[in-house]
Amino acid sequence: MPIGVPKVPFRSPGEGDTSWVDIYNRLYRERLFFLGQEVDTEISNQLISLMIYLSIEKDTKDLYLFINSPGGWVISGMAIYDTMQFVRPDVQTICMGLAASIASFILVGGEITKRIAFPHARVMIHQPASSFYEAQTGEFILEAEELLKLRETITRVYVQRTGKPIWVVSEDMERDVFMSATEAQAHGIVDLVAVQ
């Protein structure tokens, strides 16, 4: 039986009355975001708007993005990554379950030295995929070209942010590569493994 979204007390600075807000709004006010689902346009736009709003509100206080996601739409994930690079505050990324596919790309996009994985977290990288079987021949070729460009971009970002040679990243992206938190740290995707 679903419990819904819990309400928690919140008092704005300078106000005497406490109001009840849903837990996500309370966490947003503390600059904490959660990517706990498949990446799509809706969650991407929500996270982007929150990052931009809070960076305008106070551009010197870090933002924290907790990730437990199986991945999702590449372009939506790249939009989150680009926003993380664009906003002035550092964005700390924390993998707390699974960061797979484009979610691992978002994880690696956190501020270098501020990317963390919980001890039992898993990270998976691979090449971008598509649904070619639904396309006509002409569409198939155009989609293949676009997919190749996306793969090159993603590979370049992993190389830049992990410090690994391009041949290592390219080889790893050929198939699904699952890593433990310590393996992800050795691979340069995260900087720290949280202590139990």
From Swiss-Prot:
It holds the Pfam family CLP_protease. The keyword Transcription does not apply. It catalyses: Hydrolysis of proteins to small peptides in the presence of ATP and magnesium. alpha-casein is the usual test substrate. In the absence of ATP, only oligopeptides shorter than five residues are hydrolyzed (such as succinyl-Leu-Tyr-|-NHMec, and Leu-Tyr-Leu-|-Tyr-Trp, in which cleavage of the -Tyr-|-Leu- and -Tyr-|-Trp bonds also occurs). It comes from the Eukaryota. PROSITE patterns: CLP_PROTEASE_HIS (PS00382). Signal peptide: none annotated. GO terms for biological process: protein quality control for misfolded or incompletely synthesized proteins. The active site is at residues 101, 126. It is found in: Plastid, Chloroplast stroma. Its EC number is 3.4.21.92. One of its GO terms (molecular function) is serine-type endopeptidase activity. Component of the chloroplastic Clp protease core complex. This is ATP-dependent Clp protease proteolytic subunit.
